[in-house]
């Protein structure tokens, strides 16, 4: 019990270091990189920690630094900056992956879980050429987007919403109603290929 409490305390401290950073600029959204300390051993970061690649074998767990922030069971990585307020927009190049999840998660979500499996993460998932929403391991289909080269995510913290955006049409495809109770971070999972993030963007006009 004491060990579990200590782990939770360390995770909270890790998250607290990043609180408030995302809302310092009124016009631009959260600017982030991927946090290597959270990345599962099957994942490798690239392009100055803005992209992530999946490796079937990955690194030997013994060669990866042990820390409480790292995901141990699932190929997940979190961003390094938390959101506690405001409207934020970022994009993800998805053309090189056929199976992935993108969204947001509580900064202290369990590192033994996967985004979309628990009830403290909210994601859009792409698998078998179809899109779904995913929360607490429950999936619902999302229609009308196909597989574009790039998609956008619009986070509206106070409104408790996360939307998938069609970048080419600058329009919302689907909106997830969320239940934020504290700081959240952009979150990513993949099982093939690579994802590339683009953050620090203005919310497009009309969204």
UniProtKB/Swiss-Prot annotation:
Entry-linked Gene3D superfamilies: 2.60.120.920
Modified residues (N6-acetyllysine): 53, 130
Gene that this sequence comes from: SPRYD4
Gene Ontology CC annotation, any one: nucleus
Protein species of origin: Homo sapiens (Human)
Entry annotated with the keyword Acetylation: yes
N6-succinyllysine: residues carrying this PTM: 139
UniProt xrefs under SUPFAM superfamilies: Concanavalin A-like lectins/glucanases (SSF49899)
The name this protein goes by in its record: SPRY domain-containing protein 4
């Amino acid at each position: 019990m004491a060990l579990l409490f200590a782990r939770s305390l360390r995770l909270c401290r890790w998250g607290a270091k990043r609180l408030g950073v995302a809302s310092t600029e009124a016009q631009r959204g959260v600017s982030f990189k991927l946090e290597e300390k959270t990345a599962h051993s099957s994942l490798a970061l690239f392009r100055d920690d803005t992209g992530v690649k999946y490796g079937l074998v990955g690194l030997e767990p013994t060669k990866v630094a042990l820390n409480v922030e790292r995901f141990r069971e699932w190929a997940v990585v979190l961003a390094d900056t938390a959101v506690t307020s405001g409207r934020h927009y970022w994009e993800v190049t998805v053309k090189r992956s056929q199976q992935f999840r993108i969204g947001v998660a509580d900064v202290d979500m369990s590192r033994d879980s996967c985004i979309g499996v628990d009830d403290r993460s909210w994601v859009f998932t792409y698998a078998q050429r179809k899109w779904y929403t995913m929360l607490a391991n429950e999936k619902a289909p999302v229609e009308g987007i196909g597989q574009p080269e790039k998609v956008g995510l619009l986070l509206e913290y106070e409104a408790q919403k996360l939307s998938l955006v069609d970048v080419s049409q600058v329009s919302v495809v689907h909106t997830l109603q969320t239940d934020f109770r504290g700081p959240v971070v952009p979150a990513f999972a993949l099982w093939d290929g690579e994802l590339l993030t683009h953050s620090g963007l203005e919310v497009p006009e009309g969204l």
